[in-house]
């Protein structure tokens, strides 16, 4: 996966609890990395999750795909990069890349999210987030100090 607007959003050190009997990071541990990446991406776009929760909006994961390329090992420091790739009326897609200490890509993933209210009804993506997400997609974010604007 090569996405021009992927940005490093977090680092994570693999713990013993993340590993399986083969002493590598268990495949089921990766979705937590995507959650960390997603939360930090939103924060960097100026829209931290607590703001949405306060408005009664939630991002439900409706689809996840992951390609595991190389294993992560205990105590490796991983780099998580993420980018918004698609924004629709009540859905959005995010891509992720997890790199190991040597810079090799260990995993790539995509998650698709529905914006829901507290009753699980679909809701429009708020205009201000839509604009920030579209800026991430195109690399034209206009906010001062934004990660897509030097």
Where are these regions (language model features)?
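Catalytic strand-loop segment that frames the active site of acyl-thioester-processing enzymes
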Residues: 1-47, 150
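Hydrophobic aliphatic residue packing
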Residues: 14, 24-25, 61-62, 80, ...
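Conserved beta-strand segments that form the floor/walls of ligand-binding pockets within enzyme
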Residues: 26, 61, 67, 79, ...
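Generic structural detector for well-ordered beta-strands
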Residues: 11-15, 67, 114
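HotDog/MaoC-like acyl-thioester-processing domains
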Residues: 3-10, 43, 73-74, 85-150
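Active-site beta-strand->loop segment that positions catalytic residues and contacts the acyl thioester
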Residues: 62-77, 83-89
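Short, basic/aromatic beta-hairpin or loop at an interaction surface
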Residues: 52-59
């Amino acid at each position: 996966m090569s996405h021009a607007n992927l940005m490093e959003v977090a680092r994570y050190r693999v713990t013993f609890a993340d590993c399986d009997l083969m002493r590598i990071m268990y495949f089921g541990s990766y979705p937590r990395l995507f959650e960390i990446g997603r939360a930090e991406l939103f924060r960097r776009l100026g829209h931290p999750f607590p703001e949405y929760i306060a408005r009664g909006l939630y991002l439900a994961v409706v689809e996840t795909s992951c390609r595991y390329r190389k294993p992560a090992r205990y105590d490796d420091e991983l780099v998580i990069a993420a980018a918004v790739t698609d924004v629709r009326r009540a859905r959005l897609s995010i891509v992720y890349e997890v790199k190991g200490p040597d810079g090799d890509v260990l995993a790539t993933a995509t998650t698709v999210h529905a914006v829901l209210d507290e009753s699980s009804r679909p809701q429009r993506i708020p205009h201000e987030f839509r604009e920030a997400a579209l800026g991430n997609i195109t690399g034209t974010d206009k906010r001062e100090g934004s990660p897509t604007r030097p």
